[in-house]
Amino acid sequence: MIPQRIKELEAYKTEVTPASVRLSSNEFPYDFPEEIKQRALEELKKVPLNKYPDPEAKELKAVLADFFGVKEENLVLGNGSDELIYYLSIAIGELYIPVYIPVPTFPMYEISAKVLGRPLVKVQLDENFDIDLERSIELIEKEKPVLGYFAYPNNPTGNLFSRGKIEEIRNRGVFCVIDEAYYHYSGETFLEDALKREDTVVLRTLSKIGMASLRVGILIGKGEIVSEINKVRLPFNVTYPSQVMAKVLLTEGREFLMEKIQEVVKERERMYDEMKKIEGVEVFPSKANFLLFRTPYPAHEVYQELLKRDVLVRNVSYMEGLQKCLRVSVGKPEENNKFLEALEESIKSLSSSL
């Protein structure tokens, strides 16, 4: 029998609507140069497809440890960060003890808890999209959650939560998962805490820096925590092709990546400045590779107007506190220009129809 908690869930939906400018999934806008991809494919040809992959992904771990400036024993790898979020929801605290989540945020935190039947302590962000510390402390003292998820920067709002507020919550016995999926666009991290403390881990991913198709997520933590999380990790969870290709792309493509990441940051700031000039658009500062914006019009109408102009963004107005809001990923300059033009036209079209 399917339990009621599963029946009440909805399958996670990804955006598959066709458009020539797709700025809805926070993907890295640049593919690797052909010569680097060719090197990765050469290594891929050597993979024995009839054999299971290295269950510990030792060679990839060595490259990732160097890339992030940590030791191999501080790493757990997953089939994307989503898998690691599930492992943390399984391993940290008894399943009847609540999970703390500031909202709106990345949906997988809530989904992983609900799948396991874990109670939730959800606290709405304040008007600046920061943690409402007073309300959080009130509910933490009452409900006693032992696990908390913090997207840093937060998705979909793009801002960094106040570090001191996260530390205050941690001081009240909440194990803190700091999801740094967008670390390369903010430069802010809890990595030092994760390496020294047993109540903090950091999540990173290769998906936001050009390797989304490989599905490689990284948990960074103290050795004792890593050992416990590994007990619930599924065997052979990172495929051989992903291990081999990520290793090549991170070593031979590192200079390319760092250069293009800076281009994305530069484009983000340009988009922010240009969006502020469009009458009726309120755009919020971001430390990620996307921007949240609000208009006076229903979000689904703005979404459709943009789609008419062959531009796809994400409608996030269904999320707590984000009425009339949409999220746009930072693309290549020419894609961003097309979005900016389409947004201005869309707003004019909607205003003239009133």
From Swiss-Prot:
Keyword Transferase listed: yes
Pathway(s) this gene product operates in, as recorded in its UniProt entry: Amino-acid biosynthesis; L-histidine biosynthesis; L-histidine from 5-phospho-alpha-D-ribose 1-diphosphate: step 7/9
Protein's name according to its UniProt entry: Histidinol-phosphate aminotransferase
Quaternary structure and partners: Homodimer.
Record keywords, A-Z: Amino-acid biosynthesis, Aminotransferase, Histidine biosynthesis, Pyridoxal phosphate, Transferase
EC number, as in UniProt: 2.6.1.9
Domain of life according to the entry: Bacteria
